[in-house]
Regions:
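Glycine/serine-rich phosphate-binding loop and adjoining beta1-alpha1 elements at the start
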Residues: 2, 8-11, 18, 24, ...
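Residue-level detector of alpha-helix initiation sites
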Residues: 92, 152, 193-194
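Adenosine-phosphate binding glycine-rich loop
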Residues: 134-176, 284, 289-383
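Short glycine-/small-residue-rich Rossmann-like dinucleotide-binding loops
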Residues: 85, 91-92, 111-112, 236, ...
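An N-terminal-biased, well-structured beta-alpha scaffold segment characteristic
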Residues: 5-10, 14-122, 126
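Rossmann-like adenosine-cofactor binding region
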Residues: 225-306
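Glycine-rich phosphate/diphosphate-binding loop of Rossmann-like nucleotide-binding domains
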Residues: 22-61, 168-255
Length: 383
């Protein structure tokens, strides 16, 4: 059960922590969860930082840079998991890492539990505490630890979509921006949040015809103000169907915090789409907003259903590891330092936003959306 409420008098740090940074093992994942500057700050606060050998290479960061910052380079991944009070990662624990999770260990990473019941149950069984980047919500209702990767994924979705519209990739053979005398591609973006907005910016830059659908009229007004050359439409079942018929490239960009993405495109809709059209479902890590979505990898990123190309890579930002690592660590490192310096309970007590990131604690689901998704008992986290 969640810990009981308690008072924390002001004062120095409660105790030092051992913070572990393992190398990411998800397919073609090149990000790392901590920069050398973050390791230095943790060390200066009295914590010990263990970094797996080669963890930063995919982002152009060498072991020597971590060592200069005071981190200890460890060759054995299992040793890091065994010694660390807090594990900082980028992607959710992979099956090979399930046995390494342990009681009372803090796991600070992206989880996206709603799309993965097995992961949810394994973390529950382990007794570890899951602090999820993607559900931390600030006072304005924003998701500050998800935003940078949503920006990257939104921009990448157009890059990848443009590539797979090419004929050698089984696409329609269309240049996204067209050329003089030839019309450009029609890009339909489902969702006008961070992903959708960034996708639209890039698509407009390419010269495509862009339509964004959202069910928030205020958001549509905002998008119309900042991108007057983009068509904004209120999202409903009929409008989505009408737009799918016209689309060359569809971007799935919907999000419900902590929950599975709503299904907006059904299997039957694919038969109305153009042969060789492309769907990039950025919502795949929350289950996807297309009925035919299934997770793919950078190694084997696409598949075809009813002559429509599906690109459903669940870790798109991992392909641009250097950009993504710096963007991610800029926002996650302050929270990692705070948790390490104060302990999770004190940090959550002092920061009323932090409990929103705590999804699992002491074998209990502490996020309502995750509990509802799998029919599990929900208990709010109380620091």
């Amino acid at each position: 059960m969640p810990s009981s409420s308690r008072r924390y008098p002001p004062g120095a740090k409660l105790r030092s922590m051992i913070v572990g940074v393992p190398r990411e093992i998800k397919s073609h994942e090149y990000r790392v969860a901590l920069l050398p500057v973050g390791a230095d700050e943790l060390r200066r606060s009295g914590n010990q930082v263990l970094v797996e050998r080669g963890a930063g290479l995919g982002s152009g960061i060498h072991d020597e840079q971590y060592e200069k910052a005071g981190a200890i380079i460890v060759a054995d991944r299992a040793e890091i998991w065994a010694r660390a009070d807090m594990i900082i990662k980028v992607k959710e624990p992979q099956p090979d890492e399930f046995p390494l999770m342990r009681e009372n260990q803090i796991l600070f990473t992206y989880f996206h539990f709603a799309a993965d019941e097995e992961l949810t149950r394994r973390v529950l069984e382990s007794g570890a505490t899951a602090v999820a980047y993607e559900t931390l919500q600030d006072r304005q209702g924003r998701l500050p630890l998800l935003t940078p990767m949503s920006e990257v994924a939104g921009r990448m979705s157009i890059q990848e979509g443009a590539k797979y519209l090419e004929r050698p990739e089984e696409g329609r053979g269309i240049l996204l921006g067209g050329v003089p005398g030839v019309e450009p591609a029609h890009v339909v973006i489902l969702g006008g949040g961070i992903v959708g907005t960034n996708a639209a910016k890039v698509a407009v830059g390419f010269g495509a015809n862009v339509t964004i659908l959202d069910n928030n009229v205020d958001r549509l007004r905002y998008l119309d103000d900042i991108m007057p050359n983009v068509t904004t439409l209120f999202s409903d079942r009929h409008t989505i169907r009408d737009q799918l018929v016209l689309a060359d490239l569809v971007i799935g960009a919907v999000l419900i915090r902590g929950a599975r993405a709503p299904r907006l495109v059904e299997r039957a809709d694919l038969k109305t789409m153009k042969s060789g059209a492309v769907i990039v479902d950025v919502a795949v890590d929350q289950g996807g907003c297309v009925e035919t979505t299934r997770p793919t990898t950078h190694e084997d990123p696409t598949y075809i259903v009813d002559e429509v190309v599906h690109y459903c890579v669940a870790n798109m930002p991992g392909a641009v590891g250097r950009t993504s690592t710096y963007a991610l660590c800029n926002v996650t490192a302050p929270y990692a330092v705070r948790i390490a310096n104060l302990g999770l309970a004190r940090a959550a007590h002092d920061d009323p936003c932090l409990p929103s990131a705590i999804n699992i604690h002491q074998r209990t689901v502490t996020d309502q959306a995750v509990a509802r998704t799998f029919g599990l008992t929900f208990h709010p986290y109380v620091p």
